[in-house]
Amino acid sequence: MKYGIVLFPSKKLQDLANSYRKRYDPSYSLIPPHLTLRASFECAEEKADQLVSHLRNIAKESHPLVLKMTKYSSFAPVNNVIYIKAEPTEELKTLNEKLYTGVLAGEQEYNFVPHVTVGQNLSDDEHSDVLGQLKMQEVSHEEIVDRFHLLYQLENGSWTVYETFLLGRGE
């Protein structure tokens, strides 16, 4: 089964992201706006209990964190993804690193760049045009996030919550 680990931001930030995702993100209908803490991975269903136990322990030893969104940016020229950048705080980086330990041990494919995607799979021209417009807009959003979510992918490609973990409590 394919899993992923994410933070879901507040409705206010999700609404902002969705105002662009509706038009510029083909994954709009498959998953709500989110910040990926650990890239998707495969795990046998019979190991799900081990996975959940490990994530509970990580949540228990972690604390709620500040999510501060600072600007629009892009992964171009590597790929044409436009996103709202989150400040990479120590707490966020530490949580990301913990999600590559124990039963989740493995190498990260990319450096951790905390963000919420607003557009992807854009042509070069569309990417340049949309990013140019967004960079003229100011982003100043801050919130406290007190949970992360283990998601799994359904057969139709959409993602749904398997379990939610409260930071500082492990529940």
Curated annotation (Swiss-Prot):
Active site per UniProt: H34, H115
EC number of this enzyme: 3.1.-.-
Domain of life: Bacteria
Transmembrane segments: none
InterPro entries for the chain: 2H_phosphoesterase_YjcG-like, Cyclic_Pdiesterase, YjcG
Keywords noted in UniProt: Hydrolase
Catalytic EC class: hydrolase
An example molecular function term from Gene Ontology annotations: hydrolase activity, acting on ester bonds
Residue ranges of the motif HXTX 1: 34-37
Motif window: HXTX 2: 115-118
One Pfam family here: 2_5_RNA_ligase2
The UniProt record lists the keyword Hydrolase: yes
Subunit structure: Homodimer.
Membership in a protein family: Belongs to the 2H phosphoesterase superfamily. YjcG family.
HAMAP family linked to this entry: 2H_phosphoesterase_YjcG
The name this protein goes by in its record: Putative phosphoesterase YjcG
Species, as recorded: Bacillus subtilis (strain 168)
